[in-house]
């Protein structure tokens, strides 16, 4: 894969906000990305962060199909000028990522795509910039932070209950965040191979590259603890506190 660009232009950068989930763990009848966080929906905050990044040329929103019209209304009222289209998501995370890829099929293979969870509304401009910068050298990047907790691997005993099988070295472990960034040629090839495999499923785009393009290095960008994923009701309270105290913007 060549990372060289024609001298007359830099790579175009598209960012896709993945908002196809239903947020069942939030215990809400509404998708979590449409819940309000300090006066704005979670979706708006994620979209606004990517729109504010000077490196990003275009933002695509991949939305839960049942709430597509609601998302269109919310984002139209917010005047997010970089949002070019809002498309329906798939039944799985990988299908929503594929929808994002299809939405930028007019981009060249050397252009860039950032895939970001809508449920991470506190992503910083520094993190977005770092992803784009690293993609001048490699074809895939993932944002991650060191684990402050010990992580164990479990198995089931004879009674069907979990027991510890191994304790991996914490120094070598990272907790993945988003955005995850790619040269479009890399992520296109990875997903083409993945979807050719019967029963393919994935929850992480870097993992798709790692599995289906093992020769392609996936570089780590050090993330920020404030870039939390709003999954449970308590996460919403934490996000509100981070905004209130100025730890996140």
UniProtKB/Swiss-Prot annotation:
Single Gene Ontology BP annotation: isopentenyl diphosphate biosynthetic process, methylerythritol 4-phosphate pathway
Entry-linked SUPFAM superfamilies: Nucleotide-diphospho-sugar transferases
Enzyme Commission number: 2.7.7.60
Gene3D superfamilies per the UniProt record, alphabetical: Spore Coat Polysaccharide Biosynthesis Protein SpsA, Chain A
Pathways per UniProt: Isoprenoid biosynthesis; isopentenyl diphosphate biosynthesis via DXP pathway; isopentenyl diphosphate from 1-deoxy-D-xylulose 5-phosphate: step 2/6
GO MF annotation: an example: 2-C-methyl-D-erythritol 4-phosphate cytidylyltransferase activity
InterPro entries for the chain: IspD (IPR001228), IspD/TarI (IPR034683), IspD/TarI_cytidylyltransf_bact (IPR050088), Nucleotide-diphossugar_trans (IPR029044)
Site description Transition state stabilizer, residues in chain: 25, 32
Site positions for Positions MEP for the nucleophilic attack: 170, 229
Protein name: 2-C-methyl-D-erythritol 4-phosphate cytidylyltransferase
Source organism (scientific name): Thermobifida fusca (strain YX)
Gene name, Swiss-Prot/TrEMBL: ispD
């Amino acid at each position: 894969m060549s990372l060289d660009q024609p001298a007359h232009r830099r790579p175009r950068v598209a960012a896709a906000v993945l908002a196809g989930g239903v947020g069942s763990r939030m215990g809400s009848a509404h998708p979590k990305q449409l819940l309000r966080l300090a006066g704005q929906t979670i979706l708006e905050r994620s979209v606004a962060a990517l729109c504010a990044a000077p490196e990003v040329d275009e933002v695509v929103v991949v939305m839960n199909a049942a709430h597509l019209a609601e998302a269109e209304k919310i984002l139209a009222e917010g005047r997010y000028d970089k949002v070019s289209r809002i498309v329906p998501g798939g039944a799985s995370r990988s299908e929503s990522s594929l929808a994002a890829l299809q939405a930028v099929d007019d981009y060249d293979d050397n252009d860039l795509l950032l895939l970001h969870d809508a449920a991470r509304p506190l992503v910083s401009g520094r993190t977005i910039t770092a992803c784009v910068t690293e993609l001048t050298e490699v074809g895939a990047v993932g944002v991650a932070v060191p684990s402050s907790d010990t992580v164990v691997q479990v198995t089931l005993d004879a009674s069907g209950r979990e027991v510890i099988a191994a304790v991996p070295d914490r120094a070598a472990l990272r907790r993945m965040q988003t955005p995850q960034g790619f040269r479009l040629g890399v992520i296109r090839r990875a997903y083409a191979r993945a979807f050719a495999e019967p029963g393919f499923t994935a929850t992480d785009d870097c993992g798709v590259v790692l599995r289906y393009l093992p020769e392609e290095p996936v570089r780590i960008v050090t993330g920020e603890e404030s870039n939390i994923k709003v999954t449970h009701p308590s996460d919403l309270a934490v996000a509100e506190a981070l905004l209130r105290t100025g730890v996140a913007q």
